[in-house]
């Protein structure tokens, strides 16, 4: 196996373990976990494919402990959508010659909490149509706000540490897509 592939799998394993542990051990805090922020940071450092793989591993393994159901697909979908939006933003910033800054990216991470809720709630649209979707989403809006605020705070905490630790590795591995 190519050494970069081994490094990629190892990094996904490490970050997934952090995400999984946080989902399990912080479950008493409603929607306040570092998972979305770590996924955003992973896309920034290692690219879209890495972020998608991290999202799938995090969701499937943590849901083996927390409960597996139809929502698992929509959780994966939500984090993949966040990966796509993050990659689009990174490509745009690169095109205009800008580097992502801490506070604006924390604000971006905040809004991704609402994106997550909108996408996860799509299950209700399929089950009960637009009326159920709207009611379900509105009922969960407080939890999406917890998610958003948690993302903002966790991004401010995690980004400086993870970027410092993994930036050199991402350049060495050349996982990031150009």
Residue ranges, per PLM feature:
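Membrane-embedded alpha-helical hairpins and interfacial helices in multi-pass inner-membrane proteins
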Residues: 68-73, 98-178
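Structural signal for the C-terminal ends of transmembrane alpha-helices
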Residues: 45-49, 85-94, 161-167
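Helix-boundary and loop/linker segments of multi-pass membrane transporters
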Residues: 1-5, 29-30, 94-99, 129-133
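Short helix-perturbing small/polar motifs within transmembrane alpha-helices
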Residues: 8-16, 54, 74-125
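Interfacial aromatic-anchored transmembrane helix boundaries in multi-pass membrane proteins
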Residues: 20-32, 56-90, 128
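Hydrophobic transmembrane alpha-helices of multi-pass small-molecule transporters
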Residues: 37-40, 63, 83, 87, ...
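Hydrophobic transmembrane alpha-helices
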Residues: 1-41, 45, 49, 53
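Transmembrane alpha-helix boundary and packing residues in multipass membrane permease domains
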Residues: 40, 59, 83-87, 121, ...
